[in-house]
């Protein structure tokens, strides 16, 4: 399967479910810690859907988080109206009551990154079913979820991926994610090709940003090929087989009527007042967009650097801490950008580790920059130290690593002169090029000196010594 995809028009809408960090579940006092607990220990009659079990009123923190999320996505909050919890009926082993409780919208008609937000609401997570062994763990049952339903405005897999990355960054800024952040998405996609509009297909329970991207890439090709052969894209629900990176038909597409929504008679509706919304707004943190704007204005960095820094809350906070510790001026800001946004980020990506788990803190970078400014280490050695910090999970400070490994800048002038003369002797072609006016040959010779000294030479002094000998 393949071919040119430029002639295919894609429409995609996402239903995104994000677990939020509350101590207790949405409708009972059971712990939400299902990852570390023994199976079926953090449960009660409400979690297990036992007859006669009465749910508590909705978890207040979960409602407040839903309001915050809706506000940050530009939604209008549904105020002074009853917000009901409904029973959404379907049969599956992880749903002991036979229905899932889900609220009517808390926020509507928003926009984020140019993608329309249809609604934001709360719902409870079902349990965890393992079909391979036929066992169910209900510890997760009742954990609060935020569901964000987008409009079908997404036009490409790449746009979907970027949207989800920025959305998860938003949740991290709110500080409401459980652990590293658990996200699942139902992906709705249809295409138009050769003048034919295909039916909408839903792919259920895709549990990663990468998965959503792969689903859309696969479905674009699959649906295009069906239309190309004169067939009809079926309106259906499909499953994502992550191990094979393909989708597989599950059943015909459900409608709202299939779920038999009814208001839950055991839960009183909630009403959000304007006063409550204002109180929540006062507690809301700075958004990534606002932080990016402030970094550009306050520190004078360019927009691309600011965008990269604020895409990771830990990195943004480290940048500010480093700059304030060193003193806010252009030199220190530039150094902080270089060693955090460029070098530390490079090392983290290479070693496939996130900043928050790397053990590298602001004080490590502050000490590293001071060693550079004081001429104790060269730029090349500083890059090695960054890698060592990541590898060793920040267990040792830069100064300690430099002393242990003998990485300080060479102060012995005779040793430096010897390395310079050796580089000149071993590279006659570069010497000839320099004497013929090719100034870049000087940089090559400097690189040879740095290689001979294992990066411990002072580049400025090396250039001076090279010129003294070559310009005679």
Curated annotation (Swiss-Prot):
Superkingdom to which the source organism belongs:
Archaea
Name the Pfam families on file. Answer: GatB_N (PF02934), GatB_Yqey (PF02637)
The record's top EC class is ligase
One biological process GO term for this chain? glutaminyl-tRNAGln biosynthesis via transamidation
Q: Which reaction does it catalyse?
A: L-glutamyl-tRNA(Gln) + L-glutamine + ATP + H2O = L-glutaminyl-tRNA(Gln) + L-glutamate + ADP + phosphate + H(+); L-aspartyl-tRNA(Asn) + L-glutamine + ATP + H2O = L-asparaginyl-tRNA(Asn) + L-glutamate + ADP + phosphate + 2 H(+)
Q: Which SUPFAM superfamilies match?
A: GatB/YqeY motif (SSF89095), Glutamine synthetase/guanido kinase (SSF55931)
Q: Which UniProt keywords apply?
A: ATP-binding, Ligase, Nucleotide-binding, Protein biosynthesis
Q: What EC number(s) does the entry state?
A: 6.3.5.-
The molecular function GO annotations come to:
asparaginyl-tRNA synthase (glutamine-hydrolyzing) activity; ATP binding; glutaminyl-tRNA synthase (glutamine-hydrolyzing) activity
Q: ATP-binding: is it a keyword of this entry?
A: yes
- PROSITE patterns to which the protein is assigned, alphabetical: GATB
The entry describes its oligomerization and partners as: Heterotrimer of A, B and C subunits.
What family is it from?
A: Belongs to the GatB/GatE family. GatB subfamily.
Q: What does this protein do?
A: Allows the formation of correctly charged Asn-tRNA(Asn) or Gln-tRNA(Gln) through the transamidation of misacylated Asp-tRNA(Asn) or Glu-tRNA(Gln) in organisms which lack either or both of asparaginyl-tRNA or glutaminyl-tRNA synthetases. The reaction takes place in the presence of glutamine and ATP through an activated phospho-Asp-tRNA(Asn) or phospho-Glu-tRNA(Gln).
Which protein, by its recorded name, is this? Aspartyl/glutamyl-tRNA(Asn/Gln) amidotransferase subunit B
* Source species: Methanocaldococcus jannaschii (strain ATCC 43067 / DSM 2661 / JAL-1 / JCM 10045 / NBRC 100440) (Methanococcus jannaschii)
């Amino acid at each position: 399967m393949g071919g040119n995809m430029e002639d295919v028009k894609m429409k995609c809408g996402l239903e995104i479910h994000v677990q939020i960090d509350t101590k207790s579940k949405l409708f009972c006092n059971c712990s939400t810690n299902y990852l570390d607990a023994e199976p079926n220990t953090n449960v009660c009659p409400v979690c297990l859907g036992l007859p006669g079990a009465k749910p508590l009123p909705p978890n207040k923190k979960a409602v407040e988080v839903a309001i915050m999320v809706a506000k940050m996505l530009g939604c209008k909050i549904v105020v002074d109206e009853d917000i009901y919890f409904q029973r959404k009926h379907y049969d599956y082993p992880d749903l002991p009551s036979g229905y899932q409780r889900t609220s009517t919208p808390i926020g509507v008609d928003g926009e984020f990154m140019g993608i329309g937000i249809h609604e934001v609401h709360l719902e409870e997570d079902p349990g965890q079913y393992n079909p391979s062994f036929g066992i169910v763990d209900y510890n997760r049952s009742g954990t609060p979820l935020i569901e964000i339903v987008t409009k079908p405005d997404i036009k490409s897999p790449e746009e979907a991926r970027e949207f989800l990355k920025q959305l998860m960054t938003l949740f991290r800024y709110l500080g409401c994610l459980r652990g590293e952040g658990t996200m699942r998405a139902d992906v709705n996609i249809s295409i138009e090709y050769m003048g034919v509009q295909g039916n909408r297909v839903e792919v259920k329970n895709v549990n990663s940003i990468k998965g959503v991207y792969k689903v859309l890439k696969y479905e674009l090709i699959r649906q295009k090929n069906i239309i190309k052969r004169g067939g009809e894209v079926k309106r259906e629900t499909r499953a994502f087989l992550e191990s094979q990176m393909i989708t597989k038909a599950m059943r015909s597409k459900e409608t709202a009527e299939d779920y038999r929504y009814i208001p839950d008679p055991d839960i009183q509706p909630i009403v959000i007042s304007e006063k409550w919304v204002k109180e929540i707004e006062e507690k809301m943190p700075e958004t990534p967009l606002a932080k990016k704007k402030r970094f550009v204005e306050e520190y004078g960095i360019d927009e691309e650097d600011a965008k990269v820094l604020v895409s990771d809350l830990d990195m943004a906070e480290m940048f500010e801490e480093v700059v304030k510790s060193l003193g806010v001026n252009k030199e220190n800001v530039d150094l902080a950008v270089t060693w955090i946004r460029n070098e530390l980020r490079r090392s983290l990506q290479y070693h496939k580790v996130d900043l928050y788990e790397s053990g590298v803190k602001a004080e490590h970078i502050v000490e590293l920059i001071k060693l550079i400014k004081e001429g104790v280490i060269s730029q090349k050695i500083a890059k090695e130290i960054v890698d060592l910090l990541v590898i060793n999970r920040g267990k040792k400070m830069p100064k300690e690593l430099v002393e242990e490994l003998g990485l300080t800048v060479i102060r012995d002038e005779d040793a430096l002169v010897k390395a310079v003369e050796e580089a000149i002797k071993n590279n006659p072609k570069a010497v000839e090029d320099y004497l013929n006016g090719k100034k870049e040959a000087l940089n090559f010779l400097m690189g040879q000196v740095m290689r001979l000294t294992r990066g411990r030479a002072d580049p400025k002094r090396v250039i001076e010594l090279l010129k003294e000998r070559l310009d005679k």
